[in-house]
């Protein structure tokens, strides 16, 4: 089944998405997501100028061979741009293969391992009271796992805080320059346990409670924080410290039993190897769009299963609905599933990407349409051209550049 066309689309129905569409000689099409927030045009160029021409004439069924060709053939292996491009190709080819087999992707992968995919939502607020109101709203929607972030007294901005009450959190700022945010570790460490205490006192322990530290702490600060919140029985603390220094997670492990989730910025199994092998984390957060697609994620998940590490895939709305659809198929199948992040999408976004998934009482299902179960409206997408936007940077209160 030869590939006859490979096209790249960059569209901004509220935020930028990079979509790959592959067409075979039989007229079967497959979609892949290559979105890399703040660096979308780099990936689009990598696909358009380098990978797409080399797809023409290839057998779409030879997914593994194509994956290896683009990974090993590049010589400059790994990295977010290369791996996001490979991920999109892989995703689109699995979409084609499942459509050719006339079955949903999760069936082609080996069938469902569960009835539905537990997803976690994001709650936020400028104050504890606002965060509690947002928590209650998501609780009423049926979510069983809820991430809680909040504005911190004495800090004008912080990660995870929406720009207005009831609005979804949107980190990227449109324009040619990123927003600069200030950070105070001591204010954070003093305040955040008070937020968790308020949540548990009001809502109890019925829902899984999650929190994202977003790489802000040093190893010893992360250890101190994890120990201080053990009574609140967190589902996980996410990205407590930059994961480039993987050895430091031994120190964190020595001081706290709060579960740890890491990996949303990882691009391959090699990035995950030490943390998984030494059981320094409990959840691996790699995502289909950045870690090699279905093929790459299967390797990571299989390796993680040997060490009882579960998946908790990154899934914010700066990954397109194509990624979300693929992730739900993967999550429904993968044996060592933990949870899936789900921020949701605007009506405008879902008009460009008509989908087939469903949400019911805290669980999602990808649907049973052949392939990924998602479409792409090219004409509508063309009405939303690319708009420059960048993720923020963080500085300490004295002006020192810090980890955002």
Swiss-Prot record:
Pfam families: MR_MLE_C (PF13378), MR_MLE_N (PF02746). GO terms for molecular function: hydro-lyase activity; magnesium ion binding; mannonate dehydratase activity. Induction: Repressed by RspR. Gene3D superfamilies: Enolase-like C-terminal domain (3.20.20.120), Enolase-like, N-terminal domain (3.30.390.10). InterPro entries: D-mannonate_dehydratase-like, D-mannonate_dehydratase_GalD, DgoD-like, Enolase-like_C_sf, Enolase-like_N, Enolase_C-like, Mandel_Rmase/mucon_lact_enz_CS, Mandelate_racemase_C. Transmembrane segments: none annotated. GO terms for biological process: amino acid catabolic process; carbohydrate catabolic process. Overexpression prevents homoserine lactone-dependent synthesis of the sigma S factor (rpoS). NCBIfam families: ManoateDhtManD (NF043051), PRK15072.1 (NF011654). Probably involved in the degradation of homoserine lactone (HSL) or of a metabolite of HSL that signals starvation. Belongs to the mandelate racemase/muconate lactonizing enzyme family. This is Starvation-sensing protein RspA.
